[in-house]
Every structure is written in structure tokens, then in C-alpha cells.
């Protein structure tokens, strides 16, 4: 009987961890979108303004797809949101790029979280997001 109870507790704990992981990933994606949009409105460079606008559009589309596929895997919804979404407002291009590099590292780290072969679809969408970020970083080299 003790084993059966331990299995139920273990399942609940695993389910709770999955919900927390889901919530953290979505929170980070919302933060990425907010940082890009806030910098888009803040920059005085037309080239940066246009590049961040295009990045935001692409990220918004791919992040939406990622989250919908992620939730669709177990037909779930996000029940519990992180209580705080950090609003980061980079003061300049250097700070903004540093934040973009942080998000790029976060995206690369998803490889360790999605190790099952059935998660290859999520990693493919993640790769599209990484591609958008890397192209954006290249385009930023033109904005002086």
C-alpha cells in the first residue's frame, strides 16, 4: 500500500514540475517579446526600428506556434502563470544585444529539456526562433 501511495505522489510531483516548466518557458517567451517591442519603440535608429519590428513579427508567430504545439502534446492549458513577468527595458543597444544573447542561450538550453524524440517538433520550431534571432543579430551590424 505504501508503494501505491508513493507512485501517486510521484505522479503529482511530476505533473507539478511539468506545469512549472511550462509556465517558466511561456514567461520567458513573453519577456523576449516585451524586450524586443520596448526596444523597438525606444530606438532612434530607423534601421534598428525596422529590424526589431520584423523580429517581433517573426518571434510572435513562432512563439505562438511553439506554445500551441507544446500545449497540444497533452491537450493542456496553462493553469498557473508565473506571478511576475519581468519587464526589461534595455537602456542602449549594448544592453539590448546582451539580453538577446541571453535569450538565445535560453533557447539553446531547451535541447536539454526536450530530449524525447517526440519533442523534435518543438525543437524544430525552436530552431526557427534561433534562426530569426541570429539573422536579427546580423542585421544589427548594419545599424550604426
Enumerate the predicted regions with their spans.
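Amphipathic alpha-helical coiled-coil segments
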Residues: 65-70, 136-144
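Conserved alpha-helical segments that form or flank metal/cofactor-binding pockets of metalloenzymes
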Residues: 50-79
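Helix-loop segments that flank and shape redox-cofactor active sites
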Residues: 31-54, 113-118
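Disorder-to-helix initiation segments
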Residues: 18-26, 32, 93-96
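Non-transmembrane amphipathic alpha-helical segments
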Residues: 36, 66, 107-110
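Alpha-helical initiation/capping and key positions within long helical/coiled-coil segments
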Residues: 24, 28, 51-54, 58, ...
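Acidic/histidine-rich alpha-helical segments that form the ligand environment
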Residues: 85-140
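Arg/Lys-rich, intrinsically disordered low-complexity tails that mediate electrostatic binding
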Residues: 1-21
